Amino acid sequence: MIIETIIGNIQTLPSLPPHIERVYMASDDLVKRIQRVVTDHGRELGIRLKEAKELADGDVLWMDDHNAIVVSVLPEDLLVIKPVSLKQMGEIAHQIGNRHLPAQFEEGEMLVQYDYLVEELLQQLAIPYKREKRKVKQAFRHIGHRHD
């Protein structure tokens, strides 16, 4: 089966069929328009999205009256950073930016993929954080550039 469009997301669709198969994906795979995946029931799918749209947790790839195939993002090893002041936020944002590390922001938290050097920096700067496994809503985007 070849999937070319995303039907919707389980958060916004009015109803779902009684049985759901899941395609477990790492967040890095959410940005790939063309890939081969296997559901938790062993069904092979080819994904070849016509639009340049990223996949997201809960996206419905296929559905009929009895079944749906849904994307489920695997939890990632993250540093969840909770600065307590604007100064702390500025310090850590500057340091993470200098390292060209992608970050995401959710409800007052900064999320970065686990890196022992960033963890050491957080400890040195006494910025509150915790390490945890968590699903992210979108892929971390690495934006490359060069310094001239």
Curated annotation (Swiss-Prot):
GO terms for cellular component: cytoplasm. SUPFAM superfamilies: Urease metallochaperone UreE, C-terminal domain, Urease metallochaperone UreE, N-terminal domain. GO terms for molecular function: nickel cation binding; unfolded protein binding. Pfam families: UreE_C, UreE_N. Belongs to the UreE family. Keywords: Chaperone, Cytoplasm, Nickel, Nickel insertion. This is Urease accessory protein UreE. CDD domains: UreE (cd00571). It is found in: Cytoplasm. Its main location: cytoplasm.
